[in-house]
Design a protein with these regions (language model features):
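Cytoplasmic-side transmembrane-helix entry/capping segments in multi-pass membrane proteins
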Residues: 25-28, 83-92, 140-153, 200-209
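Specific alpha-helical transmembrane segments that line the substrate/conduction pathway
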Residues: 55-66, 97, 102-145, 182
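Hydrophobic transmembrane alpha-helices of multi-pass small-molecule transport proteins
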Residues: 68, 91, 131, 140-162, ...
Length: 235
């Protein structure tokens, strides 16, 4: 019989013995890996049925809503009540990060490949660095300059690849513009989220910001789309 102490052994749960920095890096890599699949699934959804970006994003938000309601409730039970300043910060960042950024991203994927979209969208860390340097008094390190150069060189190569396949410069430019707007709004969100997370905690902030963006997305859907858009038209 296996005792409970056996499962606490490093061989069963090695992350229990990791440092905070190592665990943070592992979680960030896992998040980036999962985040990378989003564009692939969105492209598959566009190919499977005639659906617009607003409807698809609305469905995505609704499916995720129960999880964020639970996380927000659990994280807020023992926490102090939110002030007006907290709510203002949550509304602004929720609209910027998960509503505007996601909407621009879904619109861009109607025009460009998932590969180019990923490359452009993942420039948001470098954009966050630039925002910090230009507006928050932070310094730019040499390794960050190298990361910026590599990021934009990769975008140039992927852009040329998409253009050679699509043959439609206008479509590629429109799609790239939407996705770059998504990266920029998400970078602004990331820069503003740092003090919000310190004040509210990461789980509470993320859940409440997502609830704000979900509300905004549903309002956008009901204003611009008929309810029949939620009914699949394919076989």
């Amino acid at each position: 019989m296996i005792s409970q102490n056996t499962y606490a052994h490093p061989a069963f749960m090695p992350w229990k013995h990791w440092s905070a920095e190592r665990l943070g890096i592992a979680l960030a890599v896992l998040a980036a890996f999962g985040f990378s699949f989003k564009a692939i699934f969105v492209k598959l959804a566009y190919a499977a049925a005639p659906v617009d970006a607003v409807t698809l994003l609305s469905l995505r938000m609704v499916f995720a809503l129960p999880a964020f309601l639970w996380i927000g409730f659990a994280a807020s039970r023992a926490a102090p009540p939110l002030t007006r300043r907290d709510w203002g910060m949550l509304v602004a960042l929720g609209l910027l990060g998960y509503y505007a950024s996601s909407m621009l991203d879904f619109l861009g994927l109607q025009y460009i490949s998932a590969g180019l979209e990923r490359l452009i969208l993942f420039t948001y860390p470098t954009l966050t660095v630039l925002i910090g340097v230009l507006f928050m008094g932070k310094s730019l390190e040499k390794r960050q300059v190298g990361a910026l150069a590599l990021s934009y060189a990769g975008i140039g190569l992927a852009f040329a690849h998409d253009l050679s396949i699509a043959g439609d410069l206008r479509a590629v430019l429109i799609g790239a513009g939407f996705v770059f707007g998504s990266a920029l709004t998400y970078a602004l969100y990331s820069a503003g989220a740092e003090p919000a997370i310190r004040r509210l905690g990461s789980a509470r902030f993320a859940a409440l910001a997502m609830l704000v963006s979900t509300t905004a997305t549903q309002i956008h859907f009901f204003i611009t789309q008929p309810l029949s858009a939620l009914i699949p038209s394919g076989p």
